[in-house]
C-alpha cells in the first residue's frame, strides 16, 4: 500500500494496481488499512470486495474526526488521552497542514488518573502546536486548576508564550 495523497478529507492509496480513497486520515490509518487488506488476502477474500468495504470505512467517533466550516476552517476532534496518541495526532496534522495554517490545540487531562502524563501531554502539545489552550477535562474529585498547573510544568520556557489556560472547557473550545 502506497500513500498517494494525505489530506484532511482523507487518504488516496495505491493498493496493488488499484487506487483507493478512504475518509480516514494519516499514516497510522494507512498502516491499519494495510493490515486489513493483508488479513483479507490471507483469508482468501476477493481484492475488489475488500477494497469496496475499505472505502466505506469511517472514523470512530472522537478519533480524528474532522469538520470543515463554511469559512474553510478545519476542526479536528480527537480524544487522545496518552502522550503517544497526542503526539501522533499532532504530527499527522502538521504533516498535512500548510505553513500558513494555524494549529490551535485544546487539551486537558482527566482527574483521578495518571498524574505523570499531565506534563508530558502539555510538553507535546506546546512543542507541536502554534497555540495551546489548557483546560479542564473531567476533573472528577480533583481541582481542575491544580490539574492544569501540573500540566503547565511540562511546557518548555520557549513555548510558554504560546500557551494559555481556560479552566471552563466550553469557553476554551470557543
Model-identified regions with their sequence ranges:
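Nucleotide phosphate-binding/pyrophosphate-handling subdomain across enzymes
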Residues: 8, 16-131, 153
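Structural signal for short hydrophobic segments within the conserved structured cores
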Residues: 1-2, 18, 163-164
Amino acid at each position: 500500500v502506497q500513500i498517494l495523497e494525505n489530506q484532511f478529507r482523507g487518504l488516496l492509496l495505491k493498493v496493488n494496481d488499484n487506487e483507493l480513497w478512504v475518509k480516514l486520515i494519516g499514516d497510522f490509518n494507512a498502516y491499519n488499512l494495510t493490515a486489513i487488506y493483508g488479513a483479507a488476502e490471507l483469508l482468501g477474500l476477493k481484492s475488489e470486495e475488500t477494497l469496496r468495504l475499505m472505502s466505506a470505512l469511517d472514523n470512530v467517533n472522537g478519533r480524528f474526526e474532522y469538520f470543515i466550516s463554511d469559512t474553510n476552517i478545519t476542526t479536528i476532534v480527537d480524544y487522545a488521552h496518552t502522550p503517544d496518541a497526542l503526539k501522533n495526532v499532532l504530527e499527522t496534522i502538521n504533516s498535512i497542514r500548510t505553513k500558513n495554517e494555524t494549529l490551535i490545540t485544546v487539551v486537558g487531562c482527566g482527574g483521578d488518573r495518571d498524574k505523570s502524563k499531565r506534563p508530558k501531554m502539555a510538553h507535546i502539545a506546546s512543542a507541536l502546536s502554534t497555540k495551546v489552550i489548557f483546560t479542564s477535562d473531567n476533573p472528577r474529585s480533583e481541582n481542575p486548576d491544580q490539574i492544569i498547573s501540573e500540566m503547565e510544568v511540562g511546557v518548555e520556557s520557549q513555548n510558554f508564550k504560546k500557551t494559555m489556560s481556560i479552566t471552563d472547557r466550553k469557553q476554551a473550545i470557543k
